[in-house]
From Swiss-Prot:
PROSITE patterns: RIBOSOMAL_S7. It comes from Shewanella sediminis (strain HAW-EB3). GO terms for biological process: translation. InterPro entries: Ribosomal_uS7, Ribosomal_uS7_bac/org-type, Ribosomal_uS7_CS, Ribosomal_uS7_dom, Ribosomal_uS7_dom_sf. The gene is rpsG. One of the primary rRNA binding proteins, it binds directly to 16S rRNA where it nucleates assembly of the head domain of the 30S subunit. Is located at the subunit interface close to the decoding center, probably blocks exit of the E-site tRNA. One of its GO terms (molecular function) is tRNA binding. GO terms for cellular component: small ribosomal subunit. This is Small ribosomal subunit protein uS7. Pfam families: Ribosomal_S7. Keywords: Ribonucleoprotein, Ribosomal protein, RNA-binding, rRNA-binding, tRNA-binding. HAMAP family: Ribosomal_uS7_B.
Length: 156
């Protein structure tokens, strides 16, 4: 953290095909080893496949999937008097998006389909229908926060 001034957050340019900042962020999450064009191909193919199967707009499917995966609460470890408590905390909107995207990509990578585009399309469709591994991850996080609600007064 700089001491002199607060550094502003860098503005992300919207993606070229759909002109969406959310999609540009998602492309950056998928990208590995700086291969952005490969990541774009994967995402566009996945969105096309999902759009054909569900006959909805590309961005509508992505937004619905993200909405069902974004966590509203999470637990953070807090040490109090020699013991560690899992304290439930609300998740800020930027982190909410980041976690949702990360969980979607992780779930897609673990799937069994042949190409990454098909895996991602399958996970996006599952998430938009409120099922799938990424949604299960969010439910687990929410369940953990609910179970540790008694420690909410340790929040900082």
């Amino acid at each position: 953290m700089p001491r002199r001034r607060v550094v502003g957050q860098r503005k992300i340019l919207p993606d070229p095909k759909f002109n969406s900042e959310l999609l540009a962020k998602f492309i950056n999450v998928i990208m590995q080893d700086g291969k952005k064009s490969t990541a774009e191909k994967i995402i566009y193919k996945a969105l096309d496949t999902a759009s054909e199967k569900k006959s909805e707009d590309h961005l509508v499917i992505l937004e619905a999937a993200l909405e069902n995966v974004r966590p509203s609460v999470e637990v953070k470890s807090r040490r109090v008097g020699g013991s560690t408590y899992q304290v439930p905390c609300e998740v800020r909107p930027v982190r909410r998006n980041a976690l949702g995207m990360r969980w979607l990509v992780e779930a897609a990578r673990k799937r069994g389909e042949k190409s990454m585009a098909l895996r991602l399309a399958g996970e996006l469709l599952d998430a938009s229908d409120n099922k799938g591994t990424a949604v299960k991850k969010r439910e687990d996080v929410h369940r953990m926060a609910e179970a540790n609600k008694a420690f909410a007064h340790y929040r900082w």
